[in-house]
Amino acid sequence: MTANLVAVCFAAGEPLRLARFWAGVLGGELTGGGRDVVVLVPRGETGFGVRFVSGSGPKLGQNQMHFDLTSVSPADQRATVAKSLGLGARHIDIGQRPEEGHVVLADPEGNEFCVIEPGNAFLEGCGFLGAVACDGSREVGLFWRAALGWPLVWDQDEETAIQAPGGGPKITWGGSPVNARAGKNRLRFELSPGAGRDQEGEVERLVALGAGRVEGDRGVAGPVVLADPDGNEFCVLAEGVAGS
């Protein structure tokens, strides 16, 4: 009786433009109700969608969450970087060392992502979208293990990672110290209630696990916004609602 991860949601200044960028990088079909809400339909290896909604303000600091893309060869890594740059990405410096093999880029709205070097054993078998990498404590990693019911696949030196039982991207947390948040997060998780549970029942379960309410109910068909133990917002959708 655990929640389902429906999507990783980006708050964007131009949702359609950002969605087209990520569709070009990740592949997949775009759907949605207009320019303010666009969905990148999940692929089989991913299991969750990527949603783009209107609402991003000025970027005040490094995001708490980013995508790690994998490579099968040096040529493949270069091709992913070149393709991303051609679609509107740019190189950025977030303190990575010259000897590190991954390439750090930002999408057209400044959201960081990494193109990981080939041979990375931790992400082996995870698919092209290898991980959703988060800045967060061990406590929050254990919270999300319980929230989603995904097995804990890494738990060392305060770093944690979970992965769906059927495989796909890992969700990782880098451990303490956790960077101070700079305003409301641009990326967040969107959940739907588990089987046999309604929205309020799911909210109550998540609160019992350590989440806190940051906004009240938004009506019959609206999402409930919560915060995980590190203060990162996420939302629980109403039953039968595919996105907020």
Describe the residue ranges of each PLM region.
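Intrinsically disordered, low-complexity segments enriched in Gly and acidic/Ser/Thr residues
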Residues: 180, 186, 190, 196-201, ...
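Vicinal oxygen chelate
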Residues: 3, 7-10, 48-52, 81, ...
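Conserved, structured core segments of small domains
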Residues: 50-55, 60, 68, 72-75, ...
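Hydrophobic, helix-prone linear segments
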Residues: 1-47, 51-63
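Short hydrophobic/aromatic beta-strand micro-patches
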Residues: 11, 68-72, 133-135, 190-194
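Eukaryotic phosphotyrosine signaling hubs
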Residues: 5, 62-67, 129, 184-189
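Short, conserved charged micro-motifs
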Residues: 16-20, 74-80, 139-141, 196-202
